Amino acid sequence: MGYATAHRRVRHLSADQVITRPETLAVEEPLEIRVNGTPVTVTMRTPGSDFELVQGFLLAEGVVAHREDVLTVSYCGRRVEGNATGASTYNVLDVALAPGVKPPDVDVTRTFYTTSSCGVCGKASLQAVSQVSRFAPGGDPATVAADTLKAMPDQLRRAQKVFARTGGLHAAALFGVDGAMLAVREDIGRHNAVDKVIGWAFERDRIPLGASVLLVSGRASFELTQKALMAGIPVLAAVSAPSSLAVSLADASGITLVAFLRGDSMNVYTRADRIT
């Protein structure tokens, strides 16, 4: 629920004039995530696809792995000033897990909140940063043609509708190795955009995401590589640079990591055998 954009009048200064004009802004709002009624974390996100975001987040945290691990996802009513009815503000979500699914340990998951720029920054311990995947993308035999990869960034840009209006959102997209775009999501946080597309697959019982490519609009960080690993994605591509830890994790887990995917060129850092 909620709106991805807001409007505000701004004063625009250029070399020859000063004018007041309307401007479209990307919305950033907090989302409190609860599991079985217990608060787990607060993330700063762009409203929209919240159910996908939360389920993708829980998958990346190793809490759930398959659709049947989640019973329900629902917005919570919350009393706020001017809203004495307790009606939902669409900024608090509760996930009810299936019997036997262990909820996250809130003592090590997040200390306070997750910023829109970094999802692991709020981790309470170094041990809580790394998760063990139930899937093994290193054994995925899928291959993808270099020309198919080169065409993906343009497809992603064309699908970034809110970015085109605001210039303020990251994007993530899932592709089949044949180049077909499966899903694209935008968010002010790059990790949220990835959680949303992974949550899209989770809701459709498509985890693990074998024979797929995850494309991100910015850099390839450790955290995004870990999310790809947790979802069983064999190929991670980024239009910008990778970090050293992202390359190390991709190498250790058998993920093909492609970065600087721009125009007619790319760098392949790990498992280059998948690129044909």
From Swiss-Prot:
One Pfam entry name: FdhD-NarQ
Record: active site: 118 (cysteine persulfide intermediate)
UniProt KW Ligase keyword: no
A GO CC annotation given for this chain: cytoplasm
Keywords from the UniProt entry: Cytoplasm, Molybdenum cofactor biosynthesis
A single MF term (Gene Ontology): sulfurtransferase activity
Family listed: Belongs to the FdhD family.
Summary of the function given for this chain in its UniProt record: Required for formate dehydrogenase (FDH) activity. Acts as a sulfur carrier protein that transfers sulfur from IscS to the molybdenum cofactor prior to its insertion into FDH.
UniProt cross-references to PANTHER family, sorted A to Z: FORMATE DEHYDROGENASE, SULFUR CARRIER PROTEIN FDHD
Protein name as annotated: Sulfur carrier protein FdhD
Species assigned in the record: Mycobacterium bovis (strain ATCC BAA-935 / AF2122/97)
Gene name linked to the record: fdhD
